[in-house]
Amino acid sequence: LKTYMKSAIFFLIILICLPKTKARTILIDPGHGGSDEGAKTSKYAFDNKGKRVRRTIFEKDLVLSVSKKIQKKLKEKNYRVFLTRSVDRSVSLEKRASIAQKVNADLFISIHANASYQKLSGGFETYYLNNQSNRAIKKVEEVENKGSQGEDSIVNQILIDLVVKRTVESSKLLAKSIHSRVKKSLEISLKIKDRGIKPGLFFVLALSKRPGVLLEMGF
């Protein structure tokens, strides 16, 4: 989250990625919310009295702001665009997925802003639904799957319903489309590291049962 100011322009890049898609209904999922603050960072700013103060920036607030901008711009392009939350409140991963079913979304895009305690770590990355055994990705899964209830039963449901097999190819194509355009823009203009396109078993993507990606938009 340490490059969150750079990440705030991310929604403009996403707008470039979507105009050619045949999908007309898009569900934007601002990660975290309510008591789940997500990652956080701090910066110095001046208050209304001109005093320099240290302020904390939470991932939940940043991704909500970015998601609202995405929604506004895409609506101007005549897309049907919904948010899983429009205010700072807790929404379970199951509820987020049920919203996708309710609005009959063609695409599910979950917006996050990763973090690291290592100063040299950072960059942007795009995840699509698929199982894997990479330890680093497992750590990301643990963070982003915290809002789920009954993880074991969910994993069984994923395996039984074969959600991964049904959506992996379309989700991977979506991830490649978005990521390639992000890469061209961010690496050149903001010099943010490309951390690649990666598979991940994210419950919110699996439960939505449709093509989707989880975007870690820069840290």
Residue ranges and their predicted role:
Residues 12-20:
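Hydrophobic h-region of N-terminal signal peptides that target proteins for export
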Residues 22-152, 165:
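Catalytic-core regions of hydrolytic enzymes
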Residues 121-122, 135, 157, 192, ...:
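Residue-level signal for pocket-adjacent positions within structured domains
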Residues 156-165:
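Short glycine/proline- and acidic residue-enriched helix-loop micro-motifs
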